[in-house]
Amino acid sequence: MGNNVVVLGTQWGDEGKGKIVDLLTEDAKYVVRYQGGHNAGHTLVIDGEKTVLHLIPSGILRDNVECIIGNGVVLSPDALLKEMAPLEARGIPVRERLFISEACPLILPYHVALDQAREIARGNKAIGTTGRGIGPAYEDKVSRRGLRVGDLFDKVAFAEKLKEVMEFHNFALVNYYKVEPVSYEEVLEQAMSYADLLTSMVIDVTDTLDAARKRGDKIMFEGAQGTLLDIDHGTYPYVTSSNTTAGGVAAGSGFGPRHLGYILGITKAYCTRVGSGPFPTELYDGLEKQDPIGKHLGTVGHEFGATTGRLRRTGWFDAVAMRRAIQINSLSGMCLTKLDVLDGLEELKICTGYQMKDGSLLEVSPMAAEAFEEATPVYETMPGWSENTFGAKTLEELPQAALNYIKRIEDLTGVPIDIISTGPDRNETIIKVHPFQA
């Protein structure tokens, strides 16, 4: 039985991780975020009530769960407090069940200013960031000039460090990007106001998780974004600024990698992407590509970013990119989400290879974005189904064509589909193998 489960996205994010984490945390004691920031958007629907979380782990709606934000997460105190407020208004005791690593890098207003100024300066070559300061905060961390949560509790030292780093960044804002500088006094005052609010939630995450492991507590690690957005393994440079893959769990939480158990890869029954970057199986982007099936996927699937509200680009399932995600993450099993969105389509396609300009046929996706751009997808066609799969809770409720589609994805990837999601609510799910019982 696996006590430690990793849940991560295998595509370009927005795969439906939040729902699955919420579902599986019925059996968990801890849910841990280990990378990213409030650029994530995890949507939960429980008894018809919708909750969107960006920074707080998706287990917060479970009374039995303690939630942890690990050191690999870049933390905006302002965003965190704004996210906590409506949850507390609903009677959820967030401060009693949410804990934060003192080593989390802080996102402060100058990071946001830098992020937005850079995107504007890039023009039509913009990466498509959320503009929330994620990348600049990670840059400060790597350059060893970043401020961390633990720094908030020494006002004198914090003020000195802040002054130095803001002089550095304001110089770039004014002289390179030609925008207004960020006020040091305002940032300092705001940051100091966070110290008293956060102090009760700050813990030694590594020690807490190790003690939990020794007790036999069940721990779930919740990934944000998706494998193909990983800073090292994604479609660089159209990626996020953190390691979204299974390898990021240990580094971003301080939990020993040898203790990780089942790794669940969340994948949509089709593909979506938000923002810029290559997308070989793309059908619809709302601009140049207007394939009606792609539009159907976006409309029926409600494909708008939970964080940005941006229209998601849509396309067919890509087994080639999935094979790369499986290699990187050593998946134990997959969860196929939004199967019901395919209802009513007469014909389905699965990308089984990339035809490259040099005549070669790739069965595993390349690393660089440039190589992705030149790939022409090779499709295998399968019959669709007219029956309604929405809300199905057993395999017996699925039409044979849907079962064939699921089986074909398993055959093409070599990984079992252990969970099938047929709707947004936590109970609209078919669980073949439970990760905590695998």
Curated annotation (Swiss-Prot):
UniProt cross-references to PROSITE patterns, sorted A to Z: ADENYLOSUCCIN_SYN_1, ADENYLOSUCCIN_SYN_2
Cofactor stoichiometry and binding remark: Binds 1 Mg(2+) ion per subunit.
Residues annotated to bind IMP: D14, E15, G16, K17, N39, A40, G41, H42, T130, R144, Q225, T240, R310
Entry superkingdom: Bacteria
Catalytic activity: IMP + L-aspartate + GTP = N(6)-(1,2-dicarboxyethyl)-AMP + GDP + phosphate + 2 H(+)
Molecular functions per Gene Ontology: adenylosuccinate synthase activity; GTP binding; magnesium ion binding
SMART domains: Adenylsucc_synt (SM00788)
Family indicated by similarity: Belongs to the adenylosuccinate synthetase family.
Name of the molecule in the record: Adenylosuccinate synthetase
Naturally occurring in which organism (per UniProt): Aliivibrio fischeri (strain ATCC 700601 / ES114)
Organism phylogeny: Bacteria, Pseudomonadati, Pseudomonadota, Gammaproteobacteria, Vibrionales
